């Protein structure tokens, strides 16, 4: 996949359309500690994409298989 460089300005709608088409993943990790004692730890992975894009890439890495779905029991 080649990176395309465009020198023209983009409208907000074009930027949102491109993000939904290609998708974006944000990994966040926060740890709050006081005097060496961990008080709070937060890990998050945020995926922003259209449903079609998410399903296309999730299927490629095996996230849509039945094994990836947690059981209700």
Swiss-Prot record:
A single GO molecular function term of this UniProt record: structural molecule activity
Transmembrane regions listed in the UniProt entry: none
Matches recorded under PROSITE patterns: GAS_VESICLE_A_1, GAS_VESICLE_A_2
S-S bridge residues: none
Coiled coil: none
Pfam (any one): Gas_vesicle
Location of this chain's protein in the cell: Gas vesicle shell
UniProt cross-references to InterPro entries, sorted A to Z: Gas-vesicle_GvpA-like, Gas_vesicle_GvpA, GvpA, GvpA-like_CS
A GO cellular component annotation in the UniProt record: vesicle membrane
Signal peptide (residue range): none
HAMAP family in the record: Gas_vesicle_A
Protein name as it appears in the record: Gas vesicle protein A
Lineage of origin: Bacteria, Bacillati, Cyanobacteriota, Cyanophyceae, Nostocales
């Amino acid at each position: 996949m080649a990176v395309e460089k465009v020198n023209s300005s983009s409208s907000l709608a074009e930027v949102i359309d491109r993000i939904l088409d290609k998708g974006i993943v944000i990994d966040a990790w926060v740890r709050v500690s006081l005097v060496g004692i961990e008080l709070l730890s937060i890990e998050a992975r945020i995926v922003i994409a259209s449903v079609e894009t998410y399903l296309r890439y999730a299927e490629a890495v095996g996230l849509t298989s039945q094994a990836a779905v947690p059981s209700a029991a």
